[in-house]
Amino acid sequence: MKEYNKSSKLEHVAYDIRGPVLEEAMRMRANGEKILRLNTGNPAEFGFTAPDEVIHDLIMNARDSEGYSDSKGIFSARKAIMQYCQLKKIPNVDIDDIYLGNGVSDLIVMSMQGLLDNGDEVLVPMPDYPLWTAAVSLAGGNAVHYLCDEEANWYPDIEDIKSKITSNTKAIVVINPNNPTGALYPDEILLEIVEIARQNNLIIFADEIYDRLVMDGEKHTAIASLAPDLFCVSMNGLSKSHRIAGFRVGWMVLSGPKHHVKGYIEGLNMLSNMRLCSNVLSQHVVQTSLGGYQSVDELLLPGGRIYEQRNFIYKAINDIPGLSAVKPKAGLYIFPKIDRDMYRVDDDEQFVLEFLKQEKILLVHGRGFNWKDPDHFRIVYLPRVDELAQIQEKMTRFLKQYKR
């Protein structure tokens, strides 16, 4: 019988957040073992619930959601997103510049498919949210990774960005707030990136899904607000801020001048039409979510769950000999470093796999985020403090077998 293999288009595509280590975790769970899953930022799994008014809107609009919507999304949702862009000072955004998607993930893939030819290059941060690298590869492009510097609060290394630009570079991706590091970029860094894009005629892709999960009195700046003369594509959604990851509500906004990207926009419209529309029922919660009381704010202040869990895991990690981490300013993740002079760790994927098998905690290895060395891993700090406390005890015990 003829064998069928995966497409050659997938040869360089990887998404290790849901890779081999997760497969082992699923096998263990199927055998009745209890696993603490710290591999994905899924708020509902850890007792975070959607605001009541969001659920009410969903129920009330069920009958009105039985048919297709406009391929870009329903008017009320796009109108609310346009007004949100105004609050964020993102310039030159009209209703037709907004696309609703089944989460930001859906739109990341679409945005790359519509832009890239074989061999085109896109600058992507290192570490990154790996879907960006995967989407570039799937579209036939090459992801060229620029360094984010751990010694400088995980901010992008501006000189490294400059050194990576070639005649094939079409765009730069900026993930801010950053996943997996939790870094929040100051305006000075963003302005330097904007200037690089300006000088090299690059499109800016801004992944800002965590812009409403900022702590310590900090403020998020949309990079598009600093680049009114540049074409920017900004991604955002409700999965994290409103604890509705399963609803799949994301959006993509085109801002700035558009006369020179008409062909690209035609491609985006074609791809948008091909998928008919995103989930109509979920689109109905956008207006209430963006216009109503932002209950997530309570979680990010002293005494709030996310704030306190962030503080706990930061101290717990740094109290473990040979581990260190930069304190996250935003988001749901921390990205600890292993001191390889103290511990014999040469394969970070094998490290987290053995940790899973021995300690029943699921993490993601650093190279799963396209980090260059096998010396990091990511922790999701969504569980309550009593569950997070297990990590300190179990990681301290586990590391002893790697001691030099």
Language-model regions, residue ranges each:
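A short helix-loop-beta submotif of the ANL/AMP-binding
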Residues: 138-144
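Conserved core segment of the aminotransferase class I/II
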Residues: 225-304, 314-315, 399
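N-terminal small-domain helix-loop-helix segment of the aminotransferase-like
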Residues: 2-6, 11-103, 110, 289-292, ...
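Conserved glycine-rich beta-strand-loop-beta hairpin in the small C-terminal domain of fold type I
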Residues: 287, 303-317, 325-339, 373
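PLP-dependent enzyme catalytic core of the Aspartate aminotransferase-like
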Residues: 87, 162-163, 344-346, 354-363, ...
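Helix C-cap/helix->beta junction micro-motif
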Residues: 31, 139, 199-200, 230, ...
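Active-site phosphate-binding strand-loop segment of PLP-dependent enzymes
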Residues: 144, 149-220
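Conserved PLP-anchoring active-site segment centered on the Schiff-base-forming lysine
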Residues: 114-136
